[in-house]
């Protein structure tokens, strides 16, 4: 017995020394990344030090801006951790090479330790080290053999990983197939919408096989598209959930109103409970058998319909799991989330660090980064046993991210577990019993083979990509590999162009550049995919992905890009309203950018937030007042793409090669245009004659003609030469406003 204790103590001491060496290696790299100006990359590495090797590592904790208080580490308010990347693009490749070398070194150390412990007949420690080998390298035959892994998608892994992989791929495939599947929808009469009738709001009704949707007459096309997405989601739900749905009309109807004023009008007319609170804090409410939602943009309308189907099909009733499953499906379908149980502005104050702003981003990749950092943290955060007790009226940012990411994980594992959790949560809420340990106990009685703490550990492993299979499911491009040479020079030129329009400078983020790299490489590998339509999508059969295709819709792309001609490139973008938005939009604070040879890709949608300029809000272009600016009177349709072609065709000008120079209003919001339905634009020539045109909202899918939160007035013909006058007008909360200006067309 004494010999065993001595051996165990020796092993423990050896493990401690081993962990210290691994921690030191990670800390060295983190310091290098930090000193080079990449604090977010360094942060993840220091969190790995703490999580994987030394929970009390002084170097890592203090570097992250913490101070020791007794036995705990707490944030030091005197040393806030920086979040903005300031490094040079030329440092990217060397830094990535160092990290790849570090991964190999860490894996080799674990491999040697595993072999040593196997010879010493310490299989417990040997298996632990073999598992860690696979955390650091893509594949290892010795580790796979020792762990008795099975073949999974060209890799090896455990039975659980096979379940996660197979279900994830099944859901991804269902979404990809459904995204291309059409469904019949029709505009009908004779179906009433009592909530809108009481509010005296005009509407039309669109139906599909299973769903009924009411909305504004001028949004007929969007209503049809939204119901098609609802039908697609129903098919995906049938694949994702093991329980069935009675194939009949949905029990509730849906109604979409274009702005918050109309939503308030509807709530008042229907005398809903908690009226004042709902008007101030929510964007959706169930009134009778109708779900009414504020949808100022088509993407928000899609979000609403997909969320309604996912939440209804799941049957979840508790706030945490209901919100979680809604975010899960919307995120997987669109890579964005725009609707929440409660308006986030009521929860977040005015903090404006990059991390705080990320909680406001609809970008699903940003959410994944937040979940990743949450999973790496060894203390604090929201625990899985707290999700059942989340309150819809007071969802914190951290609760929302954890509810979504945990629900997303467990849905991949076994949705029946989610249904059990939700039922227990609803029962405990009825009994007003807020007891996390009791929740865990009841769950374990239903699922004896797994515990909530075990699921939480699995959630951590999934989001931190603890094995090659989990990495293959996540398919993430690490930020350290998204730093491209020359990006800092492009950023300088970009900010010079913004300064020309009196806009604040923006910062660059490696985190926001990962999808930029993915799309740049896709375009590099597919040189025939050129032009506005092809450059703003990806084809799976050409090596693209459904998720990155969605990113490409709103990415800014320039092929044949040379940094020496950056000024000219940016000046030409004034003719492309979606690209123009980057220079006029006050809410763009941080961008992603990647350069691959002569291909430039910019992400201008992830890093949005409150404007740096005090008093800055929405604004028009050309600018208000008469600034004596001169613009081309027309834009070639070939530069704009199919959305401009369709606009001309819909207005009796099919085949025209040019369209008038567009006027734009930039709201900078990601969830649509708040004045939708209440916004007008009038354009006249020097003699006061009206210029015929069409006002278009942010409903498109090609960045050349569309940007989130941007409205565009398209003159259908080339503008008349000479002075052109315009007036934008709107109303909100019963108050009217306007912006007037003039410019010259040549």
Segments predicted by a language model, with ranges:
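Acidic/histidine-rich, surface-exposed loop or edge segments in extracytoplasmic proteins
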Residues: 25-29, 91-96, 202-224, 474-481, ...
């Amino acid at each position: 017995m004494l010999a065993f204790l001595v051996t165990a103590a020796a092993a423990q001491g050896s493990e401690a020394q081993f962990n210290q060496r691994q921690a030191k290696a990670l800390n060295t790299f983190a310091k290098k990344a930090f000193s080079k100006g990449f604090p977010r990359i360094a942060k993840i590495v220091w969190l790995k030090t703490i999580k994987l090797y030394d929970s009390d590592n002084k170097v890592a904790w203090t570097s992250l801006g913490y101070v020791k208080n007794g036995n705990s580490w707490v944030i030091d308010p005197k040393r806030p951790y920086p979040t903005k990347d300031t490094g040079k693009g030329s440092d990217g490749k060397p830094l990535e090479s160092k990290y790849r070398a570090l991964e190999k070194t860490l894996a080799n150390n674990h491999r040697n330790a595993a072999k040593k412990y196997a010879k010493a007949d310490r299989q417990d420690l040997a298996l632990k080290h073999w598992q860690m080998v696979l955390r650091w390298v893509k594949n290892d035959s010795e580790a796979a053999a020792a762990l008795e892994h099975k073949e999974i998608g060209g890799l090896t892994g455990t039975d659980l990983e096979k379940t996660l992989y197979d279900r994830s791929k099944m859901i991804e495939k269902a979404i990809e197939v459904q995204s291309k599947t059409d469904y019949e929808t029709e505009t009908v009469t004779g179906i009433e919408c009592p909530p809108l009738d009481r509010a005296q709001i005009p509407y039309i009704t669109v139906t599909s096989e299973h769903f009924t949707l009411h909305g504004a007459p001028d949004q007929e096309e969007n209503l049809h598209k939204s119901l098609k997405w609802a039908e697609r989601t129903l098919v995906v739900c049938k694949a994702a959930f093991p329980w069935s749905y009675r194939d009949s009309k949905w029990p509730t109807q849906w109604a979409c109103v274009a702005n918050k004023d109309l939503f308030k009008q509807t709530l008042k007319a229907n005398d809903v409970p908690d009226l004042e609170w709902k008007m101030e804090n929510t964007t959706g409410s169930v009134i009778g058998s109708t779900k009414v939602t504020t949808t100022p943009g088509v993407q928000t309308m899609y979000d609403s319909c997909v969320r309604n189907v996912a939440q209804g099909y799941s049957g979840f009733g508790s706030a945490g799991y209901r919100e979680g499953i809604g975010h899960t499906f919307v995120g997987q379908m669109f890579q964005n989330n725009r609707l929440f149980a409660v308006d986030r502005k009521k929860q977040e104050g005015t903090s404006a660090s990059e991390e705080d702003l990320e909680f406001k981003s609809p970008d699903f990749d940003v959410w994944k980064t937040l979940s990743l950092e949450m999973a790496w943290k060894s203390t604090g955060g929201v625990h899985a046993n707290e999700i059942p007790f989340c309150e819809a009226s007071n969802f914190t940012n951290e609760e929302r991210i954890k509810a979504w990411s945990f629900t997303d994980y467990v849905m991949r594992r076994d949705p029946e577990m989610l249904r059990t959790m939700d039922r227990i949560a609803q029962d405990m809420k009825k009994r007003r019993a807020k007891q996390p340990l009791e929740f865990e106990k009841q769950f374990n009685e239903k699922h004896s083979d797994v515990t909530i703490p075990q699921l939480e550990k699995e959630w951590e492993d999934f989001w931190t990509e603890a094995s090659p299979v989990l990495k293959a499911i996540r398919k993430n491009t690490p930020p350290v590999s998204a730093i491209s040479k020359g990006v800092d020079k492009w950023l300088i030129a970009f900010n010079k162009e913004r300064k020309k329009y009196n806009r604040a400078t923006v910062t660059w983020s490696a985190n926001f550049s990962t999808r930029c790299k993915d799309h740049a490489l896709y375009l590099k590998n597919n040189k025939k995919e050129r032009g506005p339509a092809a450059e703003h999508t990806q084809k799976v059969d050409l090596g693209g992905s459904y998720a990155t295709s969605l990113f490409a819709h709103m990415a800014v792309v320039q092929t044949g890009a040379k940094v020496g001609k950056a000024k000219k490139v940016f000046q030409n973008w004034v003719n492309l309203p979606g690209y123009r938005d980057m220079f006029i939009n006050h809410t763009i604070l941080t961008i992603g950018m990647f350069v691959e040879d002569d291909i430039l890709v910019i992400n201008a949608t992830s890093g949005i937030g409150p404007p740096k300029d005090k008093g800055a809000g929405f604004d028009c272009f050309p600018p208000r007042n008469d600034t004596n600016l001169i613009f081309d009177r027309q834009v070639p349709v070939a530069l704009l793409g199919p959305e401009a072609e369709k606009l001309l065709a819909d207005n009796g000008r099919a085949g025209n090669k040019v369209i008038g120079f567009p006027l734009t209003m930039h709201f900078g919001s990601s969830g649509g245009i708040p004045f939708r339905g209440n916004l007008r634009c009038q354009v006249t020539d020097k003699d006061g004659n009206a210029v015929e045109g069409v006002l278009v909202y942010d409903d498109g899918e090609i960045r050349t003609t569309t940007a989130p939160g941007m409205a565009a007035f398209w003159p259908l013909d080339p503008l008349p030469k000479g002075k052109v006058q315009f007036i934008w007008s709107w109303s909100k909360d019963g108050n009217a406003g306007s912006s007037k200006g003039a410019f010259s067309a040549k």
